[in-house]
């Protein structure tokens, strides 16, 4: 792969539109896995995805020009999967399995285009919604977040001259490489790139991926970014997301259906995928509630991805549950991916080494850590906590409780109903990093 001079490219930025999203594969792999299942099992469900800025102090609409945002969103609307991309999806092996994508789904994907968006401004924030069929609207989440994150980076970089840009990227590369050198000291560690949605830029994410390939070799297991996986001959990695139980729960018609919703999702998933893709995401309505009611067969799955509790605390709770179910944790897998930095990775690795198989999905701290790199302080270079979540399904409000109340999403009355139903046990408020 060619290694462009990122600073020069930023400085020579004179064209009318430099597309941030150049391919529909510039997304997380689990989106394609989920969308195939959604397309097959829930073709008539309509949803709304909404942008949510959890960093309330940042007035996003003041940082990003609306016309530039619309231009980037409009460009994404024009994209289609290319013949080369379709051949790769059809012929590549994912998670050791050929033809993971069914021919009928690939035929549907050939004609896929993103649905229209709704954009407005209010009190310094952007109000951005995506409506439509679940299979279509879901595909907006990652490109929308990547567009906004990179536009904010570009706005910050406009304040720097060519020399300052050289300094910025030289420092950022050195900072990144120091992290790589620390990770090299952890034997048998498994690290993957989960940094697409809040990246500084596509080019920077690509450089970080190349740095990990060079620096830690086989310990770098792959990337969630499908386009980068294709272009760099890496494994495309990903499991499933909170949107699945959020939507199924929103569609429930009674308490019994609501209680079964998180496990119905797993049964659906098992119809399509197996092996290392059998990873449980337990915290949508609180991990404690999930484990309390989980059927015994859930313990037979490959592993868990504890997402919103502190990694050591969350991992220990799952290990305890496995033992209660007669499972050997040393044969199970924990995937840690929530707001990881190198300090957290090191601490978690040392705590669990020899107790359980581990993998780390490294996100924003990998692809958007420019703090202290600019010759002068530029606050808009700092990453912010931005999400794009499903908020309605067939007109009904969708809810995410999480193990951290600060990450709760949904209409306040509906959130309270879910809390009354699932309980509030072991949910502890903590500052949200990313």
From Swiss-Prot:
Q: InterPro entries this protein is in?
A: N/Namide_PRibTrfase (IPR041525), NAPRTase_N (IPR040727), Nic_PRibTrfase (IPR006406), Nic_PRibTrfase-Fam (IPR007229), Nicotinate_pribotase-like_C (IPR036068)
Reaction it catalyzes: nicotinate + 5-phospho-alpha-D-ribose 1-diphosphate + ATP + H2O = nicotinate beta-D-ribonucleotide + ADP + phosphate + diphosphate
One Pfam family name is NAPRTase_N
Report the top EC class in one word.
ligase
Per the UniProt entry, the Enzyme Commission number(s) are: 6.3.4.21
Its GO CC terms are:
cytosol
A GO term for molecular function: nicotinate phosphoribosyltransferase activity
Which biological pathway? Cofactor biosynthesis; NAD(+) biosynthesis; nicotinate D-ribonucleotide from nicotinate: step 1/1
Keyword list, A-Z: Ligase, Phosphoprotein, Pyridine nucleotide biosynthesis
Q: Tell me the Gene3D superfamilies matching this sequence.
A: nicotinate phosphoribosyltransferase (3.20.140.10)
Q: Does the keyword Phosphoprotein apply?
A: yes
User: In UniProt terms, what function does this protein have?
Assistant: Catalyzes the synthesis of beta-nicotinate D-ribonucleotide from nicotinate and 5-phospho-D-ribose 1-phosphate at the expense of ATP.
Protein name per the record: Nicotinate phosphoribosyltransferase
Q: Which organism is it from?
A: Bartonella tribocorum (strain CIP 105476 / IBS 506)
* Upper classification of the organism: Bacteria, Pseudomonadati, Pseudomonadota, Alphaproteobacteria, Hyphomicrobiales
Gene encoding this chain? pncB
């Amino acid at each position: 792969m060619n290694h462009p001079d990122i600073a020069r490219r930023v400085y020579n930025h004179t064209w009318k539109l430099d597309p941030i999203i150049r391919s529909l594969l510039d997304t997380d792999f689990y989106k394609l896995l989920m969308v195939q299942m959604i397309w097959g099992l829930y073709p008539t469900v309509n949803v709304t995805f909404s942008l949510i800025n959890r960093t309330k102090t940042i007035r996003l609409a003041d940082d990003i020009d609306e016309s530039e945002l619309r231009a980037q969103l409009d460009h994404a609307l024009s994209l289609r999967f290319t013949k080369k991309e379709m051949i790769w999806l059809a012929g590549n092996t994912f998670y050791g399995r050929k033809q993971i994508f069914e021919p009928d789904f690939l035929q549907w994907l050939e004609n896929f285009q993103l649905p229209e968006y709704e954009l407005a401004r209010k009190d310094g924030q952007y109000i951005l919604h995506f409506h439509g069929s679940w299979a279509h609207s879901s595909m907006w989440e990652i490109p929308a977040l990547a567009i906004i994150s990179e536009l904010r980076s570009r706005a910050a970089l406009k304040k720097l001259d060519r020399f300052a840009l050289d300094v910025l990227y030289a420092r950022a590369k050195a900072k990144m490489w120091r992290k790589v050198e620390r990770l090299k000291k952890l034997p048998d560690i498994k690290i993957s790139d989960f940094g697409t949605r809040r990246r500084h830029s596509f080019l920077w994410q690509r450089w970080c991926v190349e740095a990990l390939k060079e620096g830690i070799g086989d310990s770098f297991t792959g990337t969630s970014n499908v386009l980068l996986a294709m272009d760099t001959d890496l494994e495309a990695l990903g499991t499933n997301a909170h949107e699945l139980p959020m939507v199924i729960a929103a569609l429930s018609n009674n308490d019994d259906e609501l209680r079964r919703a998180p496990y119905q999702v797993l049964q659906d998933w098992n119809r399509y995928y197996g092996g290392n893709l059998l990873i449980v995401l337990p915290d949508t309505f609180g991990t404690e509630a999930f484990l309390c009611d989980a059927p015994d067969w859930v313990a037979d799955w490959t592993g868990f991805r504890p997402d919103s509790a502190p990694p050591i605390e969350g991992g220990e709770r799952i290990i305890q549950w496995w033992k209660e179910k007669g499972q050997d944790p040393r044969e199970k897998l924990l995937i840690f991916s929530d707001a990881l930095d190198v300090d957290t990775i090191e601490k978690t690795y040392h705590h669990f080494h020899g107790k359980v198989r581990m993998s780390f999905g490294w996100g924003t701290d990998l692809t958007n850590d420019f703090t202290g790199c600019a010759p002068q302080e530029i606050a808009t270079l700092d990453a912010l906590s931005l999400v794009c979540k499903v908020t309605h399904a067939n007109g009904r409000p969708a809810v995410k409780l999480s193990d951290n109340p600060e990450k709760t999403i949904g209409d306040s009355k509906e959130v309270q109903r879910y809390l009354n139903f699932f309980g509030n046990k072991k949910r502890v408020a903590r500052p949200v990093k990313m």
